[in-house]
Swiss-Prot record:
Tissue expression profile of the protein: Expressed by the venom gland.
Residues spanning the signal sequence: 1-23
UniProt keyword annotations, A-Z: Allergen, Disulfide bond, Secreted, Signal
Domain of life: Eukaryota
Gene Ontology terms: cellular component: extracellular region
Location(s), subcellular: Secreted
Disulfide feature: C28-C43, C54-C119, C198-C215
SCP domain boundaries: 71-217
CDD domains: CAP_euk
Species, as recorded: Microctonus hyperodae (Parasitoid wasp)
Protein's name in the database: Venom allergen 5
Principal location class: secreted
């Protein structure tokens, strides 16, 4: 049967932790309410249980091969931009620069998984580690049938984020200006970001099998006024 698919794209954590234990993560500043803080995702959701919005939900466990594939997808695109091989952009080709390969981070992957386990397609408010701030890209795909091929899901998500390059102004590489339409791309190629970790969940929503992907990035990119990556 032919599958019906839809895509929804957003902007710019798996061992159980007993809720009786004090959460080891620090809260994050609430920028909308100075002096207040947001509770960390791992403290809000102290177990790996799926949230009540996860109708017929299941966690998609990433194998070591899946993790390496996520790195491959990201690092091939980062290398392409670094070499000056990206001709797309709203103001011309992207400049070559220094963009190193990403490594996998189990901690931020666990935080990403804990968040997608809630089956809520929006960004969590507090996901930083003790070492770094953490950025995030989200992707959601729906189908009339269950999606079983994890590599296809991962390919679609990373390629969707990167495709925003066509709208990215190359002048923002040296002095970053956040745009909702290109925030995924800039996080994928952000030069100071060194690690990535992702989580996936599948659940049923409005008759569709919905797969949600969250990839967390450390240190976070998309710093307004910062350098996306050093140009050559």
């Amino acid at each position: 049967m032919e599958q019906i698919k839809y895509l929804l794209i957003g902007i710019i954590f798996s061992s159980a932790i007993s809720s009786s234990l004090q959460c080891a993560y620090e809260n994050c500043a609430d920028w909308a309410n100075p002096g207040q803080s947001q509770k960390h995702t791992m403290c809000l959701y102290p177990t790996t249980a799926l949230g009540n919005k996860c109708n017929e939900g299941r966690i998609i466990q990433l194998t070591e091969a899946d993790k390496q594939y996520i790195l491959q997808l990201h690092n091939e695109l980062r290398a392409k931009v670094a070499s000056g091989g990206e001709s797309q952009g709203s103001n011309g080709p992207q400049p070559a620069g220094k963009i190193g390969p990403l490594k996998w981070d189990n901690e931020i992957a666990e935080i990403a998984q804990r968040w997608v386990n809630q089956c809520t397609f929006e960004h969590d408010k507090c996901r930083n580690t003790k070492a770094n701030s953490v950025g995030q890209n989200l992707y959601m795909m729906g189908s009339s049938e269950k999606s079983e091929n994890t590599h296809d899901i991962l390919t679609a998500s990373v390629n969707s984020w990167y495709s925003e390059v066509k709208d990215f102004d190359n002048r923002s590489v040296r002095e970053y200006k956040f745009e909702f339409t290109t925030g995924h791309y800039s996080q994928v190629v952000w030069g100071d970001t060194t690690h990535v970790g992702c989580g996936l969940v599948q659940y049923k929503d409005s008759g569709f099998y919905t797969t949600m992907v969250a990839c967390n990035y450390s240190p976070a990119g998309n710093l307004i006024g910062g350098t996306v990556y050093p140009t050559l």
